[in-house]
Curated annotation (Swiss-Prot):
Lineage: Bacteria, Bacillati, Bacillota, Bacilli, Lactobacillales
Family note: Belongs to the class-I aminoacyl-tRNA synthetase family. IleS type 1 subfamily.
Species in which this protein is naturally found: Latilactobacillus sakei subsp. sakei (strain 23K)
Binding site for L-isoleucyl-5'-AMP: 552
Locus of motif 'KMSKS' region: 593-597
Protein name as annotated: Isoleucine--tRNA ligase
Amino acid sequence: MRIKETLNLGKTAFPMRAGLPNREIDWQKGWADNNLYQQRQKLNEGKPSFVLHDGPPFANGNIHMGHALNKTSKDIIVRYKSMNGFRAPFVPGWDTHGLPIEQALAKKGIKRKEMSLVDYRKLCYDYAMEQVNTQRQDFKRLGISADWDNPYITLTADFEAEEIRVFGEMAKKGYIYKGKKPVYWSPSSESTLAEAEIEYKDIKSPSMYVAFNVVDGKDLLDADTKFIIWTTTPWTIPANLGIAVNPAFDYVQVLADGQKYVVAAERLNKMTDLLGWESVEILKTFKGADMELMTARHPLYDRESLVILGNHVTLETGTGLVHTAPGHGEDDYNAGTKYKLPVLSVVDSKGIMTEDAPGFEGVYYDKANPMVTEALEKNGSLLKLDFFTHSYPHDWRTKKPVIFRATAQWFASIDAFRDQILAQIEKVEFMPEWGKTRLYNMIRDRGDWVISRQRAWGVPLPIFYAEDGTEIITPETIERVAQLFAEHGSNVWFEWDAKDLLPAGFTHPGSPNGEFTKEKDIMDVWFDSGSSHQAVLAARDELTYPADLILEGSDQYRGWFNSSLITSVAVGEVSPYKAVISQGFVLDGNGRKMSKSLGNTILPEKIIKQMGADIVRLWVASVDASSDVKVTMENFQQVSEAYRKIRNTMRFMIANTTDFDPAKDTVDYAELGSVDKFMLVRLNAIIESCKAAYDAYDFATVYKTINMFLTNELSAFYLDFAKDVVYIDGQNDAPRRNMQTVFYAVAVALTKLLTPILPHTAEEIWSYLHEPEEFVQLAEMPEVAHFAGEEDLVATWNAFMGIRDDVLKALETARMDKVIGKSLEAAVTLYPNEANAALLASLDADVKQLLIVSQLTIADQAVEAPAEATQFDGVAVSVAHAEGDVCDRCRMIKTDVGSDDKFPMLCARCAAIVTANYPEAVAEGLEK
């Protein structure tokens, strides 16, 4: 019989190489075939609910790393909650209307103008659903557990119907109105934009100072005086109708190089330098309020501009006198409204100057800038022209600049319930905490929400018009449209005549002939997703309204967090969410946004194909996503290495429990050895820490806690010396069964704790354990156990670990000095102080075995440590080469090798084990 046959060398089919890219697909098929999501929901019936409401990603293209971070984070939370006492359904969603779909069709060569609107919208629908299905497969491949067969999609009939009802409820309460106001307008999209659809980029703009001649100075200013204004948008000068001043500021009339001007007193020195004035004399000082209703000659046209008061005027830039074009600026509009200034807009939907800008009509607004400048220079009104770089709003889809343009639009006003929204924000928990202040300030300061869009693909605004132009929005018309949308989808709005869309027999005093028309604009996509609290949370029996949690990127403070909060408080008088987690963006290694044009993208699909979805998921768990996250391929390599350690450690425990039946072989805690008890106490501390971290949505701490436990306490300590027990002792010997009890408990608990993060790997490990649940996802999270005397036990073993660290340092020194090679070649003598001597004497374990040395002597306190011993705090350590021969079975150097004549190659311990457990070896003898 060979010596190897007497060793309990763990054997397992659990592969060392993960092969995740292929093996994960098999697991996912098994989950689908066994309806695992539905099984988990059924198991959790009757438990307290926890609803994480999925903010809908836009359905366009394959998922990117930001999607992976977001959806995996949600999945980790939902999986944990589902295994920890909650009914936690997860309904995924998609945002499917809007300009990107139209742009995608245009790229495919589909021309909107060459077909009916209904046919075009059907193409948009088909394309959007293709994108939904693409992303659904991407998310499923990532291992996301969800109700994939019943997602919510903003283009479905049931969703659109509920969105109409949200709009109707807001209209009934008086929050919806039509007005002509300057709004963000994208000439490249030919549509209005909400604030959430704006991004800022640096551009170069003109900086221009223009003189307006005083016409009526109200007996304060002479007619030969000039007001000086500053602007960065020369093209809006044709739309100028006023000059705004701050009533509280001091202004001065000055004589500068022979010409009289008016500027703010505090800006005089700056203007003197800027305009190069050499001789400046202050003639008068007065308040801005004194200039109210003065008039000035427009520098280009034969009309007057009115001097008005406005608190928006500041002294940070410019002259303290603000060029006011009510059709092209929000502050201009608000200030001008008080003086009944007309709302004059001088560009059309494409950004082309109109006939309201004589001399510039037919010119693109940006091209009009130099033309306006030239005209002002010719008539002597241009005082100074420079150029500067500044941050300017752009269309987030087309990346082109936007302008302010007054058009007739539909708005949602929040003034009537702004305080109610702010009060609701105070009740919401935000992670990070600064999110509360950010959203609070946004709502406090935001203006009215422009909800109409001049596009084709979206939910129609359910508004009718009478023959006399009266707008018709009544509870009856809203409900009729909602029912029609629920039955036919929103295309019915474009397929049917207005009278057929109205309730049967509907009449209106403004339509004596019974004729009606319908609104052509569609709703802002943020109104779509912003209605999900009614269309999804309130509409589905398995969900709850409000949701317990939402989790999205930090850009959603001005997006979905904002729009859903407004609509929810408007119709339900409550925040749609109880807690908010915001995450940063995924950036490249240099902190740049990932984009195809920069060539710096890392796609989840690539990582999954190369390394597996569990590697992407482990990366998600390893990062602090509360701020922006930089990622490189090296990060995934590092995570892959950490994964390998997890896998190999779990494999070792599986391999060494193949002959362990937990039902028969588990040893009660009270009967375990001290070190085994210590490891179970530590395991329960790990369980407690991980569950607390999961509860706090702190996945990085879960990852670090498990990783440190596996690396420092299991691999580097317990499993390291355990080999001398589980391999060498007899199969049923108590020390071996003690250790197997610990191995198995650790394997089961860690597998459960890892399931939310590594579901594929956890299922693979679980299939090698002897647990009643077929899938670990159907098991419950481990409970935290506490044991009598555990605090003293931990204190004892922590103290021992300090001594062990000292011994390891001494062994390393001996290795470097060529005294020993491996630690098993060492004979160690310890010279402990009184406390450490008592500690070592109290241990019921073989200290030599714990230290993985062949020979150990603990000297009496009376014995003084030799000079060559390494001195530590509380113990001195002396290392020599062990005396004796190497046992061919346990590999220790012993002086009793050959003491049993039957086994001359074995030490006395191994000879006794073989004699007791392998009679054939006794009969036949042993060979190497």
